Every structure is written in structure tokens, then in C-alpha cells.
Amino acid sequence: MNKKHGFPLTLTALAIATAFPAYAAQAGGATPDAAQTQSLKEITVRAAKVGRRSKEATGLGKIVKTSETLNKEQVLGIRDLTRYDPGVAVVEQGNGASGGYSIRGVDKNRVAVSVDGVAQIQAFTVQGSLSGYGGRGGSGAINEIEYENISTVEIDKGAGSSDHGSGALGGAVAFRTKEAADLISDGKSWGIQAKTAYGSKNRQFMKSLGAGFSKDGWEGLLIRTERQGRETRPHGDIADGVEYGIDRLDAFRQTYDIKRKTREPFFSVEGERESKPVAKLAGYGKYLNNQLNRWVKERIEQNQPLSAEEEAQVREAQARHENLSAQAYTGGGRILPDPMDYRSGSWLAKLGYRFGGRHYVGGVFEDTKQRYDIRDMTEKQYYGTDEAEKFRDKSGVYDGDDFRDGLYFVPNIEEWKGDKNLVRGIGLKYSRTKFIDEHHRRRRMGLLYRYENEAYSDNWADKAVLSFDKQGVATDNNTLKLNCAVYPAVDKSCRASADKPYSYDSSDRFHYREQHNVLNASFEKSLKNKWTKHHLTLGFGYDASKAISRPEQLSHNAARISESTGFDENNQDKYLLGKPEVVEGSVCGYIETLRSRKCVPRKINGSNIHISLNDRFSIGKYFDFSLGGRYDRKNFTTSEELVRSGRYVDRSWNSGILFKPNRHFSVSYRASSGFRTPSFQELFGIDIYHDYPKGWQRPALKSEKAANREIGLQWKGDFGFLEISSFRNRYTDMIAVADHKTKLPNQAGQLTEIDIRDYYNAQNMSLQGVNILGKIDWNGVYGKLPEGLYTTLAYNRIKPKSVSNRPGLSLRSYALDAVQPSRYVLGFGYDQPEGKWGANIMLTYSKGKNPDELAYLAGDQKRYSTKRASSSWSTADVSAYLNLKKRLTLRAAIYNIGNYRYVTWESLRQTAESTANRHGGDSNYGRYAAPGRNFSLALEMKF
């Protein structure tokens, strides 16, 4: 393990403990004086728990998880958070990172993600890399959340912009960070929590240490978490016995003329004393089949055997055959995923002061870094025999002793990518490698004022919160193309240099940053009379945002110029070989002439004002209601050409009714709406490779809209609870990439019809589904069964109803590939009543992906967003925990205990056209297989 990323938990724990010696001493020897009694009253303050019906009367579509739930489910990353929640999936981006969540048939920026009420970075995709090495130069990832900092997670399925604002079309995921009280045990004024965990599927090792205190009105916490891991390994059977045979090109010295039984003419280099044979391409099929092998056959037939030297040359002229393991093989048919090094580090600090019994003032600091360093192993490291034509016309002259320097190729650089002379040659002898580095950083600083009072008091508010947060999130995606380490070596740090003729390196980089300055205020008041109870919430907010995108592209090539100077005294060709010079270049120099694709920072400034009002009320004992609305006004401004700007005014609402005829049964109905203003990616628009007339502007975009309707039945009692709901969702004005025929003047001023590829409000779609959620307490069903024995069940099914495209557009994007196949999750478990130990088994069954949901029309042609759809699969997981003396908890789990081989749709979806970092040339889908039997271990300590 790299030591600079680690920290000793024991020493750090001691350091934090000694920082609060007085608090520890008081907890150990409490005295019954008045001051101590008052102190104990202060530290019992707890944040209000978030429930499924905290904001809305019905609770339909809501999932709430606490930090204890996350620990019990052994959540080590975003893919573990919703493992047992059908209908919620993670969007894989093909580069180790993720693009957010998929809920109710939509994903990415259509599912809002926030931390403490502050929106996280949008998924931003680069439309093609500048250097032209494929579509994986972009990112499309969002920053991930550090789960050791999280107190509660609220997952809201269905349109919910009245609560979460723009982006909550299919749903929202809202995180709340921990408070000092989350780290302090009851009756104490300080607390320390340490956790160490390991997951075998991606060899991730996590360690976290946190400390909190509360004394004399002051309270605070500090949490440090570090993670280190690798790529997720597929099922072990995938690579068992797999071996690849390759035939690669190389070079040989043509010393003999096999046909004439003579020595080939040599050449000489000015400044060198001895002449040398020319370097020729080994493995060139046309030469071997049409000439060399035929000449050898003729010599044998004529009883003119080859000399030992000639036989050696014939062998050297053949392709180099190698047998490679699944781990070593590179190319489109690779069966294993790309190797990845993952690291993250996070700090969370809070400090505040309570005064007057009802007031709290505090601050927060959060800093999280994540890095995903990948080698793209689908990039073929060698040059295969099918690439021989690239090298066949080279003279084969070289200086020194390394004859392989005489063979190189000049890449076919398209005109729009700039000066062709920037890349004059790439050598055959170098390994062809590609690395993708994805680095994220999120930093937040905030101030908070909170006023808390008893419910139904005569004061002006039961609770009031005023907060200001300053957040910056940056993603840095860099694609390195290297031809500078001699095959078979791989060296990520190598670069083109003058001592390596025809070496080459290229960096295709994209920076994206979002800044938010967010001011929020909320006021809560409870009222009641003889017949009704009301809980009113009034909210205001202002968000000043900025998005900055900046591409970079830079290459270096160490090429040489060889010039024939005639003949030497032996009548042999003589060459003057110039010393290699490193030529630095960038396609940005040419792209500067295209207004749509400049390699300079492009900025969009945004502002959003919102006001919301929500009332959760009851009439008598049979009816509960919720009714709320929100008004948003967004402005986007920019000085950039060909970047959209404008004002968007959106209104959203929610309503719910819960009828409870008795204490065991209830009927609920929920209706809500959602909206999404165009994302920064859509405002910037598609990067295009040709210019437009002065004054041309991109077509305006409208906000996307969503409508959600749900009806549910719920039974609850000593036996547990069961909820069955049916929902319908409709999405309108969905923004998609499409071609639209437009007439523009050409250079002669004549109108010419061309296809303009950009973002348009192109689609409407609707879907419906069923959701089941339940838990059975078997002791409540039959008293003789052990207390703590339970069964959980969850089911979700979504069925698309309609998809309609706007006339005149030829779509270039997916339709419904974000819809998760139907999934069943059934759990059986036992928790010892005193919490000393527990165990459970989770059974999951998923149907296959319906291929019809992958089809869309591009003009008159029917296309599919992926070549394959997943099949049905099932798996079983077992987990257990053991509490020792209330301070130590050991958790363990075995996943896919049957070692079943399967592929989830979420993983296979990485091959879809919507994936920013898609492996378009994959011919082997084994790399997307789920892990085989794997385990996780966690050790938690609380003091």
C-alpha cells in the first residue's frame, strides 16, 4: 500500500482523545451538581429523524436510510447503496466513476442529487475528444459522496421538484451529513468512532476515524476517511483457461536476397564508418505470401538449400507470434475489465455553539478528493499484421544499431485536427498505450443558523433555519496516448524525447468546474385546533452558480528527417539522417478558428431564486393530506458565442391524501410534478467541426417536465407492514441529441440544406409500474417464534407505454435504456432483541432487459442503443454482525454465495450509445460480468 495515502488509526484516535481530556474525565466521573445536570441536558439534543412521511403525507416512493442502515448493509460505495432497492440503479460511465442514479426510466441529470440541500455537479459529457482517439475522452461522471460522512439518505422515486428543485424528474437522492450528536453516545459529552472495512470484489480498503464533542453549548465533529481500491473483478470463470494468440509486426534486417542467393545492397549513413542492411517489416503478409515464401519454395525445389544465415533471416521475416493471458491481452476482444487504481480522501468538520436554549450557530467544512486512474486495455499495445500497410512504404534507414528505428508510420490526421506536420511519424518499436485519469474534487464551506422550539408553541416559528454554502466541484479528465516505451514495456511516465526516434505522446484533457453560492431559509410552524393539525413549511432560496469548461490538447513527436545524398564509394545508397527533434503541437491552434470549438475556458453564469410552501395536515383521525408548491426562476448569461442563455420560469407542485379507516389499513394517493432546466452541457451545445455564419444561434430549449401519479394500499400491525403501489409517469419536452435539416448560406452566399446536430426538445414518453415493499415480523404473526425474526420483500416493475419523437428530427440518442428490468428482492433475517448479533440472507432475482426498450428511430431507420440485452439472473447474499461490549462491532458478508455467473443490465449498459466512455469496439462481453463469490468485512469501534 502506498504509505502517503494511509494514516494510523490508533495514533490518530489517541491524538483526538487527548485533545478533549476534560470531557473524557467528566464522563468517567460524573458529579450530581447543577452544572453537570445542565450539561447533560445540552448534549441530549438530537436532530429530527427523517421519515418516509416527514415531508409528504403518503410516503409513496420514499426510501430512507440512516447511518446505521448503511453500516448494516455494508455500503462501501455508490453501487452498494441501492443494492437491495429495486427501481433505483447506478449509472455506469465506463471509467470507474458513475453518472448518478437511474429512477423511473430516466437518469443522470434527471435525478437530482444533493448534500445538505446543495445540488451536486451535473453530469457533463465531452462530445468527442479533440485528439480524435475515440469517444472516451469525455467524462460524464458526477462527484460521488463519502458515505462515512452521511447521517441519512432520502431516496424519492417519482417527480419531486417541489421538494428538490430542478432535475427531480424521475426522482431525487438527498444526503444529510452527520452532526456531533451522531458520534456521541447518550450520557456522554464526547465520542470517537473508527471503522475499517474491506471489500474483495474491488479490493477496496477503507478506514475512517471521527470524533465529536458537546460541552457548555459548544459542539463539533471531525471525520477523516480514506479509500483505496482497484477495478471490480468479474466472475472468476470468465478468464479461466483463456489464452489469446496474436501475430504482431516487427522489424528484421534484410541482409540476403533469397531469390538471387546474394547479399542485399546495404546503405550508409553520413558520419558512420560501416554500411548496414535495410530494416524491413516482419510479418508483412503480401511480401511473405507473394515473394519470400515463394522464393524459399523455389530454392528447395531447385535443390538450392538455404544457408543457416538465410534461414535465420526467413524466420526473422515472419510475424511474431505470442500467447497472452487474459490479464496481459490488449485489444477489442479483451475479456477482462481495464485495470484501475482508485483512491479517495475526505474531511468533514463542523463546529457550532448553542445559546439561549433555542439558538444554534455553526459552520461546516467538507473536502473530498477522488481519483480513478485507468489503463485502457482495449487499446491494442502491439501492431497486428492487419496494420502492415501503414509501414510498407518506409525506406528502413536508421542510425546506430537499433534497426527498428527505421520503421514508422504517419497517422492519418484529418484536416480539421490541424497541421499534419505536427505528427511526422510514430515508431513501430514502441508499445501503443492509452491511459485515462479521472480526478474529482469537491469543497464546501458553510454557515448555519438554526432556531428550534417546541411544536404547537405560541412563538412565531417552531423551527427556522438560515444557511449559506459555498461549494466548488471540479472534474478533470485526461486521456494520455503514449508511444514511447519499447515493446513490451509499459511506462505511463514516458514521454517523447530526442533520444527516442519517432516517439510520441498526446494529452487530451478536459476540465469542468461548477461553483455554487447557495442561500437557503426555511420556517416551520405547527398549528392545531379541535379538528385539524397543520405543519407548515415555508422556504426561500437563492443560488448563484457558474459553470466553466476548458479543453486542452497537446502532443509531442520526436521525428527525424532522412535525406538521400546519393551514393558512397561502394555505390551504396547514402543518407544524411537529421537528429530527432521534439515537435510540440496542439490542434487547438486550428480549432481557434472555429467559434464553436475554442480551446479556451467557456463560462456560463447562472442564478436561481425559489420560494416554496408546503402544508402537511390532518382532518380528524381518518385523513392526512399534504399540499405544496414551488416557484423557480433561473437566469443563464454568457458572453460566449454559440452558447445558449435565457430565463426559465418553472412551477412545481405536490399533493397527497392518506385515508386510514382503521389502524391496520390505509389507502393513499400522490400526485406531483417535476421539471429540469437545460443542463450546462446542453447550454454549451454540441461541439461541431465546421463554422457557421456570423449571427447564427443554437435553437432555444424549453425545460423538461414530468408528471407523477401513484396510488397505494398499506397494511400494518404487529405482523409488520406491506405496501403495494401503482404509478404512472409522463415526461414531456425531453432534450435529446438529434439532427435537424437547416438551410444556411454557403461561402457563395447560397442557401444550402445541411443537418445541424445539437440538443432539441425531441421526445415525450410515458411509463407505468408497480412497487411492493414489506417487512414481516414473525414474532408478531406467531408469538412462539423468536423475537427479532423477520422477512423483507421488495419488487419493482416498470413498463414503457409510449415514446413519441418530434417530427423533423433524426434522433442520435437512446430512448428507454435507463429502465431497470423487473426485480424481486426477498430477505430472511434475525436480530437478537438486545442487538448483540444478527444475520440475514438476501435473495435477488432480476428479469432480462427487454430488447424493444433499446430501439429508437434515427430518421426512418430503426436502431438499437446496444447490441445485446441482459438475460435474467438470480443471486443470494449472506451477512451477519456481532456486537462486543457495545464498543466493538464486527460485520461480514458473502455476496453471490452460489458463485453464479451473470451480467446485470446496469453493467451491460456501458455499451450503450448514451455512455460517455463507451467501448464501442467490444467483441467480448465477459468484461461486464458481475463478480463471482466475494466478501466484505468491517470492524467498527465506538468510544
Curated annotation (Swiss-Prot):
Residues 189-943 form the TBDR beta-barrel domain. Its main location: membrane. GO terms for cellular component: cell outer membrane. The keyword Membrane applies. Keywords: Cell outer membrane, Ion transport, Iron, Iron transport, Membrane, Receptor, Signal, TonB box, Transmembrane, Transmembrane beta strand, Transport. Gene3D superfamilies: TonB-dependent receptor, beta-barrel domain (2.40.170.20), TonB-dependent receptor, plug domain (2.170.130.10). PROSITE patterns: TONB_DEPENDENT_REC_2, TONB_DEPENDENT_REC_3. Belongs to the TonB-dependent receptor family. This is Lactoferrin-binding protein A. It comes from Neisseria meningitidis serogroup B (strain ATCC BAA-335 / MC58). The lineage of its organism: Bacteria, Pseudomonadati, Pseudomonadota, Betaproteobacteria, Neisseriales.
